[in-house]
């Protein structure tokens, strides 16, 4: 399908033809909307001529219009780049054209027409396309020799030229009329008087003339274009000749070089361009690796700078247009020269950068020697450009030519210019003076490119050393800070940690002699130090970490401006503390891994036991296990509870290193606290635990209970084994206290004990009490233990509802009247004053357990039946026979202890059918037969102890007091003669070891006698489980049972 010509395509594919000087349209400027060209060609079949070269928009009556392949007329870049080039079609068809009969004549054309056309096109900044390429004989190797022999004759060409001239005038007239009506087509005029005739090689079926420019897809370089233009000039017509022949078709003398084109198009460092773009996006300022056209950023300070900048940009564009694609060798050579210029400018600028106070010859020599060698690398354009950018100083407004601006970096501004027009970097120097750069108490320093507090003038030079420290540092190592022009000299000093770039810089490890630095700076205040420290987050050290550098090299002095070693940097103690925190956290993680290997469950742990793990800190536990409610820390070395989760309700910290300095203020949810066996001297640290319900502070160094007496929610308090001497509850707020354990102290007197109205358990064993009085009855008291004191008298009426009363080891002249205690169940009255007279005890009817051992003269009044008695202990009371009231008044007795008396006959025990345990240690039982008859009646007997009797005196070792005390029925649950809760060795184990050693010394006869004794007892008591301190095995009992049957 035939396509229509568009104005945009015609303006790009055709150029206006020159006209004669007498033409009517000679004064009209050329346009690009419509093009009117004249062509004189003849068809081979008919020989008639038609009007060609005049095209109008919307005309379909021109069958010979050349058809163009178009993809998008308005977007020349989107054309089919794979289509056959017009140049190839022209030369291919010209070789097949049938030439005229006459030989050609060479008539050069006038140079004025071509020159005028070229100047007209170049004035708008764009070269027009060349139309109607004339073909003339040439020595070009691309043109065949047959075409040279068959050229058009001059007479024949002259005739056709005259006809074409007439048709051109008619076409121009018609074109003007169409332009007046439709305003679409416009005649194309030129300054020359002659028109260019078409070549005989161009036929209607051919494609259009060569399109030299195709937008951004130009396949020819500027060098080829210049060569082609000069060829056209050389083949143009000479002045003064009115008849001329078709010029020879010229081609460039050199064919297109594929290698040259690739070099000119592929020498760009695309990888470096990508790095630069990404660096800009990250906020960094990398050095420019490309040496192409530089687009300078416009300043916003005034209209004059904008106009100058526009002129500079136009000049740069025009100059770069002559050589837009330099060769690879030229670019490398240009980079080398610019690198040398930058290095030279560095040393030239060093003389003017430092102030007079620091620009001595020694200072310059020192800075030159200390400059890193990598900055003087001439062959590397990247490092050279970086050095030039770091050591350049701000200059005045740029007013030189574009060539000097682009080529000379010594006079260039220190601002980083962009390689892309759409990526202009705006530096703080571009900000106008009118813009407010203050924010609160901070203001932006335009020179040093940082924020600072108001009132600090960074424009003025100042020294960071004080007068006192001036003698400690070397005069040549003085650190000055003037303005931006001195930055590059300070950066060359390897000991200076000042930032060399706005964002980051590499700090190289240098082997420099260590010198002293000032201890304090002029701005050594706590407000600036954290802000300055945050700016050093991107320091990169080689072969040495940042912490090692500051702990070792900069420990005694800091060369960093605004920072001293005591205020800004971390001290060694801080680093040690941080290290210890890390170790503690790792210990917690390791312990948690042992307890619960699956880490996601750590946050769900409610109960945690990490006893005896050698822990000394709990730092990190609250972050790892935030839901813990019950924590056991027994047997560790914890001194502080920092790191404990605030959700803890039950804390067991027994046997640690807690002291009065330990704070519990963060554990407000504590309800149950056990801090026994620690080093507390007072309880003031627990005053904030308002939710505390139970508190155990046993085995500490407490002197009083001050600090917790206002905790009205406290229910249980245990402060045994401390150093408490006086105790007063006068102003106490412990109204809800139910259990108070104060044993093993040095309490002499207790005031206002009756203020604890809800008290149910009172334990005052092993103290120095002489009296215990209550101002009012304590009706809720159930258990009272006052053993091992010096009490002479006790009014039991003050405690009417007592159920347990322990009064051992006191100095009572007379026993208390326990008949009034109707609810008394357990009564212990062991070991009273030996000077006391005969005691007569009248227990209540509901009594169950009576402990009356170790009293010289004690008598039990049993006029009534005591059906509730289950346990009776009458050891060491000098009994010669078993009392008869035991069998008659206490028929439900389960345990009877009559040890260490003078009993030889137990005949009165036959009625006790319910007895389970019988202790007769240390009596005078001799007859085996009578014993076996009585034991046979005790069907429920399980435990029997007959040691230290004449019956078995030589077959058992002697029983120690401690063994007897805990093995017999008269055992005392608590050691009376010793303070504290020190556990004794198991008496059962002691007896077994002693018995085994004694058995090894027995002769065979005594071993046989011992065996016969055991068999006889087991025959009498078949259900016996424990005999004389040893367990009876089931095999032995079965053997005895079998033998008895």
Swiss-Prot record:
Modified residues (Phosphoserine): 360, 558
Domain LRRCT per the UniProt entry, residue ranges: 1005-1043
Coarse class of the protein's main subcellular location: cytoplasm
Organism superkingdom: Eukaryota
One Pfam entry name: LRR_4
Outcome of substituting residue 98 to A: No phosphorylation by cdk1
Name of the protein in its database record: Septation initiation network scaffold protein cdc11
């Amino acid at each position: 399908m035939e396509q229509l010509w568009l104005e945009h395509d015609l303006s790009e594919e055709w150029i206006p033809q020159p006209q004669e000087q007498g033409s009517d349209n000679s004064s009209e400027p050329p346009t690009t909307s419509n093009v009117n060209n004249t062509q004189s060609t003849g068809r081979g079949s008919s020989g008639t001529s038609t009007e060609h070269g005049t095209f109008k928009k919307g005309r379909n009556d021109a069958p010979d219009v050349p058809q163009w392949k178009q993809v998008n007329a308005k977007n020349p870049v989107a054309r089919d780049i794979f289509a056959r080039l017009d140049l190839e079609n022209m030369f291919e068809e010209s070789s097949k054209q049938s030439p005229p009969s006459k030989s050609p004549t060479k008539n050069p054309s006038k140079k004025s027409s071509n020159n005028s056309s070229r100047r007209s096109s170049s004035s708008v900044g764009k070269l027009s396309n060349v139309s109607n390429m004339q073909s003339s004989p040439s020595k070009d190797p691309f043109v065949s020799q047959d075409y040279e022999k068959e050229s058009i004759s001059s007479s024949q060409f002259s005739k056709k030229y005259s006809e074409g001239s007439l048709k051109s005038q008619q076409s121009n007239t018609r074109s003007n009329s169409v332009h007046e009506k439709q305003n679409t087509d416009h005649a194309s005029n030129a300054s020359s008087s002659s028109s260019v005739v078409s070549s005989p090689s161009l036929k209607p079926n051919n494609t259009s003339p060569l399109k030299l420019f195709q937008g951004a897809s130009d396949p020819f370089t500027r060098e080829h274009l210049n060569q082609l233009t000069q060829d056209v000039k050389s083949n143009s017509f000479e002045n003064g000749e009115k008849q001329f022949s078709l010029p020879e078709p010229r081609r460039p003398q050199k064919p297109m070089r594929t290698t040259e084109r690739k070099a000119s198009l592929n020498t760009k460092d695309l990888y470096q361009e990508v790095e630069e773009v990404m660096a800009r996006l990250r906020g960094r300022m990398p050095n420019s690796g490309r040496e192409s056209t530089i687009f300078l950023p416009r300043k916003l300070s005034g209209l004059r700078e904008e106009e100058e900048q526009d002129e500079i940009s136009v000049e740069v564009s025009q100059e770069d247009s002559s050589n837009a694609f330099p060769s690879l060798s030229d670019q490398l050579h240009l980079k080398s020269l610019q690198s040398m210029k930058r290095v030279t400018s560095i040393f030239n600028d060093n003389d003017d950068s430092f102030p007079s106070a620091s620009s001595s010859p020694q200072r310059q020599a020192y800075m030159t020697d200390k400059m890193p060698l990598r900055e003087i690398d001439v062959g590397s354009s990247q490092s050279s450009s970086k050095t030039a950018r770091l050591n350049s100083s701000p200059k005045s407004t740029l007013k030189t030519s574009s060539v000097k601006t682009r080529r000379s970096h010594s006079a260039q501004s220190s601002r980083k210019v962009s390689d892309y027009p759409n990526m202009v970097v705006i530096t703080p120097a571009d900000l106008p003076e009118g813009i407010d750069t203050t924010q609160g108490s901070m203001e932006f320093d335009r020179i040093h490119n940082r924020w600072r507090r108001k009132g600090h003038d960074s424009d003025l030079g100042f020294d960071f050393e004080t007068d006192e420290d001036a003698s400690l540092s070397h005069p040549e190592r003085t650190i000055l800070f003037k303005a931006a022009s001195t930055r590059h000299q300070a950066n060359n000093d390897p000991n200076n940690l000042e930032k060399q770039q706005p964002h980051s810089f590499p700090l190289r490890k240098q082997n420099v002699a260590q010198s002293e630095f000032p201890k304090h700076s002029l701005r050594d205040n706590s407000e600036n130090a954290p802000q300055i420290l945050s700016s050093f987050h991107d320091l990169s050290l080689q072969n040495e970490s940042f912490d090692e550098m500051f702990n070792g090299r900069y420990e005694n002095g800091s060369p960093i401006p605004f920072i001293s070693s005591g205020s800004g940097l971390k001290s060694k103690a801080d680093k040690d503390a941080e290290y210890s925190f890390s170790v503690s956290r790792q210990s917690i993680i390791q312990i948690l891994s042992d307890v619960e290997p699956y880490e996601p469950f750590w946050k769900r742990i409610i109960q945690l036991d990490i006893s005896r793990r050698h822990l000394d800190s709990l730092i990190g536990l609250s972050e790892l296990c935030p839901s813990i409610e019950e924590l056991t820390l027994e047997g560790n070395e914890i001194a502080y509870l920092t790191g404990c989760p605030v959700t803890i309700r039950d804390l067991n910290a027994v046997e640690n290193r807690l002291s009065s300095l330990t704070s519990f203020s963060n554990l407000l949810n504590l309800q149950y606290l056990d801090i026994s066996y620690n080093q507390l001297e007072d309880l003031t640290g627990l005053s904030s635990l308002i939710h505390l319900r139970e508190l155990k502070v046993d085995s500490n160094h407490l002197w009083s209970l001050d600090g917790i007496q206002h905790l009205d929610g406290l229910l249980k308090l245990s402060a045994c084994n401390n150093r408490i001497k006086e105790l007063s509850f006068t102003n106490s707020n412990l109204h809800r206290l139910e259990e108070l354990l104060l044993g093993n102290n040095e309490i002499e007197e207790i005031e206002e004990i009756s203020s604890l109205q809800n008290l149910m358990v009172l334990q005052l064993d092993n103290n120095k009490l002489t009296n215990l009085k209550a101002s009012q009855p304590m009706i809720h008291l159930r258990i009272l233990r006052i053993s091992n004191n010096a009490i002479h008298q006790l009014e039991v009426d003050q405690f009417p509802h007592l159920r347990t009363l322990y009064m051992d080891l006191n100095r009572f002249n007379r026993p208390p009247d326990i008949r009034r205690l109707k609810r008394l169940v357990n009564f212990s009255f062991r070991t009273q004053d030996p000077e006391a007279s005969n005691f007569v005890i009248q227990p209540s009817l509901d009594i169950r357990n009576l402990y009356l051992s170790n009293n010289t003269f004690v008598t039990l009044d049993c006029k009534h039946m005591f059906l509730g008695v289950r346990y009776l202990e009458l050891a060491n009371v000098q009994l010669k026979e078993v009392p008869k009231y035991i069998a008659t008044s206490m028929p439900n007795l389960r345990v009877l202890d009559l040890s260490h008396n003078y009993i030889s006959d137990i005949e009165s025990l036959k009625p006790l059918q319910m007895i389970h345990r019988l202790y007769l240690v240390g009596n005078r039982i001799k007859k085996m037969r009578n014993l076996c008859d009585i034991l046979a009646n005790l069907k429920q007997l399980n435990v029997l102890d007959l040691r230290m009797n004449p019956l078995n005196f030589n077959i058992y070792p002697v029983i120690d007091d401690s063994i007897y005390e805990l093995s017999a029925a008269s055992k005392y649950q608590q050691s009376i003669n010793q303070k504290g809760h020190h556990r004794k060795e198991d008496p059962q184990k002691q007896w077994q070891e002693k018995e085994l050693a004694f058995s090894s010394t027995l002769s065979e006869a005594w071993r046989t006698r011992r065996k016969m004794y055991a068999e006889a007892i087991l025959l009498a008591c078949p259900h016996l489980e424990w005999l004389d301190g040893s367990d009876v095995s089931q095999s032995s009992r079965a053997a005895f049972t079998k033998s008895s049957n």
